[in-house]
Amino acid sequence: MAMGGVLSSLEDCWAKGQLRDLEHDLDRFIRDNLVEIRRVMAEGRGSGTEIARRRFMRGEINDHQLVDFCVRAVLRKRGTCNPRRDIQEQCYEIEKEVWYEGERVQRPVGAERREEIARSWASQHASKWREWRLFQLLYVWEKKADLYVPILTVNDASERKS
C-alpha cells in the first residue's frame, strides 16, 4: 500500500472513531513515561534525537518540533504504547483465522490445527500488523500532539536560555 493509501486508511479509521482506544493508550503512555520522554529531549541520545536536541539548542527548531521528533523516536523504539492490547488484538486476528478455517471445513478446528494457524498468521502477518499499529500510533500522535507539547516542555524553555 502506497503512503497515500496508508494515510487515506488512517484518516478513515480516525473519522470512524476506530482509533479511540489508541488515543487512550497514547495518553496513558505519555503520562506514564513523561520522565523518559523528557530525558530523551534533554539528553538527545540515539535515534537521531541528539541532532534534534542540538538543532533545538541552536534555535533551528522550536519546542513543538523537538517534542514531536522525540516522541516519535520513543514510539518507534518501543513499537507500542500498550503491549497487552496489541497482544489481545493479534490473538483476536488469529481467532478470526481459526473461525474462517472452521467455516471452510464445516467442523470445529482441533488444537493442533489451531496452533498451525497461529504460527502461520505470526509468520505471514505479525510484522505487517505491528508496522500498521505503529502507523496508527504515529497518526494519533500527530492528531493529538498539540495537547501534549505543553506537558512535555514544562522545563525546556529555561534550558535553552542557559
Question: Model-flagged regions — what are they?
Answer:
Residues A2-S162:
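Polar low-complexity intrinsically disordered regions
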